[in-house]
Amino acid sequence: MNIRESLEALEESYMSPYASLSSRTRGRDKPEQLCDMRPEYQRDRDRILHSKAFRRLKHKTQVFLAPEGDHYRTRLTHTLEVSQIARTIAKTLRLNESLTEAIALGHDLGHTPFGHSGEYILNKICEDGFTHYEQSVRIVEVLEKDGRGLNLTWEVRDGIRNHRTSGHPSTLEGAIVRLSDKIAYINHDIDDAIRARMFTEHELPRVYTDVLGHSVRERLNNMIHDIILNSMDKPAITMSEGMEEAMQGLRKWMFDNVYKNDIPKAEEGKAQNMITQLYEYYMGHVDKLPVEYVLLMVNKGEKKSRVVCDYIAGMSDIYALSLIHI
């Protein structure tokens, strides 16, 4: 018995009957020889962590475009926070922590530069539309490794694709990431908005904070504990009705008072103009694309519009800004 087999046996001995065992994965699109040391989901976690797309998240906007100060969230810090929350829940519920972490680390790989305003404009101008969750899957299936993709397991790709609000992950680990994403962005975006002096903690609606908690720390603890208590030894990941209603209410309040506020929207038109300018330039100058993107058209028959959107979506905010005067 090698190290991987020992770890797989350990999983079977202590994990919940509802956990996704590494030894029972539905596998990869392209079969590979098993690793002697690492179970399959751990290999996926490592591949995502070492990918170019993951590294670029450090310079991609979460809510505030090019914020002044070192303590605002980026896509990378958000991703790490989602991973921490999700792993805490998965470990306590005796589910597969490696699968959970892999999904969490990969869930936002497809986000565009300039936050949701970048996604909005790419969805308008790309011939086949654009969503960050489908782009995240496209990155791991096609774009990474010069067009070869990361060849991740089915369960990780399913969790990445279905982390959105309307998604239905096929594993409990994917369901954990889906809820952890909401918990992270609501609480940490509140923290960033308070730092930006958009409002104070005391101005948050009491009807929601009396249930969720009156600080970021309280809310995180209460929401995580609620999920654990309502999901322990059950075949579903759920919150109590009161906690979920309060979370959804605060989420709506955040959309009205933060995401649609004048401060984060002040640069939105500028960001959309920059994305449009880049799209029009590369549609007319395909020869300026990196060779790996050109080869997607030559070798795989990908549409020019699709490949141009791939290239722009992969840019960091900083890199996109540096190209505006090309």
Task: Please describe what each predicted stretch is.
Residues 29-36, 40-77, 161:
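Active-site flanking loop/helix segments enriched in acidic
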Residues 67-99:
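Alpha-helical phosphate/pyrophosphate-handling elements in metalloenzyme active cores
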Residues 215-287:
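Internal helical hairpin/lid segments
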